[in-house]
Structure formats: structure tokens, C-alpha cells
Amino acid sequence: SSAASMCIRDSIMYNILDGAPPTDKIVYGTTNYVNGDTPIPKMLSQTLQQQGTFFKEVNASVVGHYAGVNTLLTGNYMFTQGLRNKPLTPTIFEYLRRLTGEKATKTWFIGNGIGNSIPLLDYSTHSDYGAQYGANFLAPIVTFGNSGDKHLKNAKVYHPEEELDPMYKMKYFLDNVWYSQGSALPNIGNTEEEKLEIKQFVRDMFQKKDSGSIAFPPISDSGDLQTIGYACEVLKRFKPTLTVIYLSNVDGCHGNFSSYLRSLHRADHGVGHLWDFIQNQVPEMSGNTTMIVAPEHGRNDDPNGPFGSSFLP
């Protein structure tokens, strides 16, 4: 896209930004005759740029991958912190829960997968905050994917008064083993009622998946779009005060340029669907929800390579 004075001439992200689809034959959509030859229809009658505030510039420092998401969630640049470490400064989840007393099921971090240390960002190691103020983390394409089908789908939801006693005995045994090794077992503070509610949600999602009734966008052919669909289900069920959704497919800064465009186009479609779902399917959140859309961090200027995974579609 090219921009001048807030006016975008062409855009493949026409739910978020103003501008019509490019007239050039760019292969970024779904497939009819040639890979990506059919743009995904627009979801919103009015772009998010028109409905909200468009920030043209951002002051960025360490913005790559984990460090970038860490910075977004904590408001602090992580110059020396690498992967496989939880944030050193409190996350927005912790600030919300500690300062307002919000319960755990009102705070969610939904990620597209469990790689790149993303699950570590649900709370920090700060001594004044930490796990007890963290967010519930969900990686839906893992939880409800092949691994979930194998290990969780047919798991029993135990009656809290009649059947949980032997389960608690096992839990306490395992907890004590953890404590005996000198570590505290992290706990974000879901009450027993909240835990049961989450278990029932997981069970319901497997049923909805089998019946084809998950709130997916009209096009859901990527991990990002499927993640958006499950995020809609979380919003519908729990009406969270704060939800962060991480879409990783757009993180293709050194890969196939055509695939990069497709991921951007699909992210736009998913964000449009998410906003439409909030306004029309979750009355408790319609009209009183703020959505902040942060872009991916750009890519190099290399074209598609002639060989291997970078070959033009």
C-alpha cells in the first residue's frame, strides 16, 4: 500500500484501512483458478480507520518477535532479555488484575501456537505482581487441534462435590513434589468455579468443532483465522475485560512475499470479523469495547526467490 496524507490509494487490508483493492493481479486471496487469485470479500461497511484513530507512526526499539510482543504487553523495551524468559516487568494483565481486583476468567491471552516463548507472556516475574495476577493463556489451534483431539476431547468433567476428592488428593501429591524441589507452583488464581467453567468451555468447543459451529470468519484457511474464531468464542462465553490476541502468520519478514501478502490479507479479514462479531454477537461488549490493532513489524525488500520455499506461489 502507498499512503499520502492519511489517504491510502490501494489496500489489501480494506477492513482496517481505507483504499480499494489493487487493480494489479496480486495473488493474495483465496484460490479460484490460480493460487490466491480471488480477494476475500470485505467484512465491514466502514473501515476501522474511519471508525477509530489511525496512528501513522510508532516509536519502536526492539520490536522483533518475542521482544516486540513483550514490549507491547509490558510497555517496556527489553534490550537484554531473550527467549525462554518471562517478562521482568509487569504485564498489562497484572496491572489490570492487581489494581482493579478483576478475576482470572476476565483476562485472556490467546496465541496462535505455543512457539517462540509466547506462552511465557501471561505474567511477569516482578516481585510485586506475578502469577497470581496473570491471564488465562489459550492456544486454540493446539488445544483443539490434533493433540487436543488425542488427549483432551474425551476428558471427563468431574462433579465438584461428588467426584473431585480423589483428583484433589492426586493434585496435592503432585504439588508437594513440586514444592519439595524448592519451587513455588504458579497459580493465576482461577477459583474452583472458574476452573470448572473453563473445563466446560473446552468440552463445549470440541462439540462445536465437531458440529462445524465455531465462530470462524467466513474464510478460515489459516492458523490466524482459526485463532480469531476461537477468540470470538472466548468473548461470547466469558465477556473478558481484557483480551490479547496474538496472530503469528504475518511474521514472515524473510519468507515468501506472496505468502506474506496472503497473511496480511487474512489478518485483515480476521480483525474485521472479530470487530463485527463483538458488535453483533456479544451485546454485553457491543458499543463499549476498545480494540487496539498493532501491525506486524515489516519485512525486507527481497522479492520471491527462484527456488525452494520462496518460489512464487
Q: Which role fits each region the language model picked out?
A:
Residues 1, 267-308:
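Metal-dependent active-site segment of extracytoplasmic phospho-/sulfohydrolases and closely related
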Residues 3-8:
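Short, small-residue-biased leader/transition segments that mark boundaries at the very start
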Residues 49-55, 101-107, 237-243, 285-290:
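Loop/turn elements at helix/coil->beta-strand transitions in domains of secreted/extracellular proteins
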Residues 150-223:
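Extended, charge-rich helix/loop segments that form flexible
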Residues 204-215, 226-273, 277:
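Active-site His/acidic residue clusters
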